[in-house]
Amino acid sequence: MTRFVVTGTDTGIGKTIFSASLARATGTPYWKPVQSGLEEETDSEIVARLAGVPVRPEAYRLVTPASPHIAAEIDGVAIDIERLTPPPGELIVEGAGGALVPVTRRTLYAELFARWQVPVIVCARTSLGTINHSLLTIEALKRRDVPIHGVVFIGDAVEDSEAIIADVSGVRRLGRLPVVAPLTSENLAAAFGANFDIADFR
């Protein structure tokens, strides 16, 4: 069954694009529990456009483009973490920013992942600094007993960095999604098919 949480080592690294590629390849519904910032195309809208799969409505749509805990406070919204529990069945759940981003003043995303016990896919850059960021993220998840399905790299190939992260962490490499340009549904599907084994996500 395709049921994963997609998190990352930082914000803006390509989690949504990878989520869209995985959702399209597997035909799996997508859910972003908390969306912060509504002025531009939202992550759910991007996935709907690129993947063509069912997209569940966000539990919280926050106007302010910031970390959920701050955005909620500015918007006057109290986030109830019980509303963020993923529903049963096949689903791709995307977090916000990195794994240690606060959802509320008391709860980090990694702590939600530990509660959910849904296997996590860690998205990481291939650019300079990714070794430290990736190993810290994986270590933080492991310390909280979060099940880690594997790591996905996004960007140009940097073989040594990708290999050392997998070797040191003991987490398997699932593949690398290159920069897709122009970013169309067809091009994204081709990139996923050329760089990942769909059996790793079933």
Curated annotation (Swiss-Prot):
SUPFAM superfamilies: P-loop containing nucleoside triphosphate hydrolases (SSF52540). Its EC number is 6.3.3.3. ATP binds at G12, I13, G14, K15, T16, I17, D43, E94, G95, A96, G97, P178, V179, V180. Pfam families: AAA_26 (PF13500). Catalyzes a mechanistically unusual reaction, the ATP-dependent insertion of CO2 between the N7 and N8 nitrogen atoms of 7,8-diaminopelargonic acid (DAPA, also called 7,8-diammoniononanoate) to form a ureido ring. Belongs to the dethiobiotin synthetase family. This is ATP-dependent dethiobiotin synthetase BioD. It comes from Sphingopyxis alaskensis (strain DSM 13593 / LMG 18877 / RB2256). The gene is bioD.
